[in-house]
């Protein structure tokens, strides 16, 4: 029975070695992946599953990329802390807040309707009496609470002593509709969304007025950590060219963008000042 026993020992060892090798391959292939972490303070994107699936399918054509969307700023920041083999997709407001702490460099910015800079506005109903000083009432917004409050405070410069009550909605257009249908007192949205509403529903938009305007800001930013190990030029190039083919264009539409553009010195200065 010795040869048989020896054969079984050999077989068991071989099987274990194979399992070990497979595990090693699986783990190391996971390690070699370049993650693209996405979190936007400006949109309330809730179709994460399809977003991840669509982006992974598209990016896999170019190499070991993996798309990871987040719905929470805290979780996103914990995840990217200390990571070098990743790219970050985040709003310009968020980038300005964390770029020093996380040693980030901006590479591209997203264009919406062909425009690099967007303006945020506060819209209210034309017939609503001037909002009582101190009590702003309900604000509809598709942006994160932190970003909404920060932007409103700088727009109104401390005019309201009470904090803003925010009604979170999926999209900017929903925020505007909320005011149109009397569900909220004010809407915090992009100027481009209001222009869109004027086209879709001129009657509803004519009942609304712009109450405050913010400064022009860049949209979504693609940023790299300073110690990025991959081929940064190749990676940036791949993202930048997404709008060149129908597949890529469809994916960036899911982020509310129509193309990417490189940042110039003036953009960087504004972003990092």
Label each PLM-derived region with a short phrase.
Residues 89-102, 180-181, 185-206:
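A ligand-binding cleft/hinge motif common to bilobed small-molecule-binding domains
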Residues 67-79, 165-177, 216-218:
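Short helix-initiation/N-cap motifs at beta->coil->alpha
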Residues 1-8:
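N-terminal secretory signal peptides that target proteins for export/translocation
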Residues 76-134, 143-147:
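Acidic, polar ligand-binding/catalytic clefts
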Residues 32-33, 38-58, 117-176, 181, ...:
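Bilobed "Venus flytrap"/periplasmic-binding protein-like clamshell domains
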Residues 14-23:
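Bacterial N-terminal signal peptides
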Residues 33-41, 112-122, 202-243, 249-272:
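Periplasmic-binding protein-like
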